[in-house]
Amino acid sequence: MDLILTTFGTYLHRQGEMFVVKIKEQKQEVSSRKVRSIVITTGASLSTDAIELAVEKNIDIVFLDQVGHPYGRVWHGRPGSTTAIRREQLRLADTEKGLRLALGWLLRKFDNQVEFLREARQRRSRLSAALTEKINALLELRKSLEAVNGELEMVRGTIMGFEGRAGRTYWEAVNLLLPDHFQFEARSRNPAKDEFNCLLNYSYGVLYGTVERACILAGLDPYVGFVHTDHYQKKSLVFDLIECYRIWADETVVGLFAARKVKPDLFDRLQNGLTLNKEGKVVLMGQFSEYLDESIRYRNRNIKRRDTVQLDCHRMANEWIGRISDEDDSDAGVDTV
């Protein structure tokens, strides 16, 4: 399991083969055999004895900043599972198997988008014909993408071409779901040109942090991607994996407009666009956090929606090194204190 220390003033130390979590006068003992990683946020501390035990047991210690982004990590210097995982990640990146992995993530994104539009079509009969046209176009592009073969290096441009065409089709459909005065011309970033893109960009930023953290805890290298190439200081794998989860932000932001919670005073004007102000962040994150924390049924267990990212990353890493079967997710728990 992942031992996550979030309470201000938490102190972690060692007692034999046990980790002891102390919060004021309360203590909780956790067997080191059950811990896969220790995640520490601001305001918590740990002893050097606890660090030594973690190193002995090949347990990663990850430090997160105030917004949940990893900024540091402690692990042992001996070859272990993280080394094996990253070696396999590098090997897969330019193989046919790597291509199938990358296509799987994008196909999952397409499926999420189609399902979202189908559900929207059921609720908005006046848009049925227009949404059906977009859905059918996405399904045709999905077929083309699924048929791609070869090594990633040779077909990367083809994949990104299909992805670009699908993106334009999808956003044209999403635009139909918004009130007329909030509709947008195209996707825009840094800064957003309109309210929809402003909310969406901030939501995607939250997801980037979630996916990066999950990669690091699972022993994956966030900088070695498959579709997105590993340019210097570019978290390519994060850009690849986030495709599976973008729909969470899409659904949340469209839902805010549908509920008429989006007002002009949630945004501040810039010279060339918009930025989300403090009130806007409260409105967005209240809705988004509730959505991410919702308990869902996933891989035969009840789990928070946000924790499925961690489960997916651990599962993938373990499969790469032959550690688990398709049915075994028994070690993917999270304990937060």
Say what each PLM segment does.
Residues R36, T48, E52, G205:
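Short alpha-helical basic/polar micro-motif
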Residues G43-L46, I51-L53, N58:
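Compact, well-ordered interaction domains used in eukaryotic information-processing assemblies
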Residues H76-G80:
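Short low-complexity, flexible loop/linker segments enriched in glycine and/or proline
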Residues S47, V67-R73:
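Short gly/pro/ser/thr-enriched loop/turn and capping motifs at secondary-structure boundaries
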Residues I38-T41, I59-D65:
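Short hydrophobic alpha-helical runs that function as membrane-insertion/retention elements
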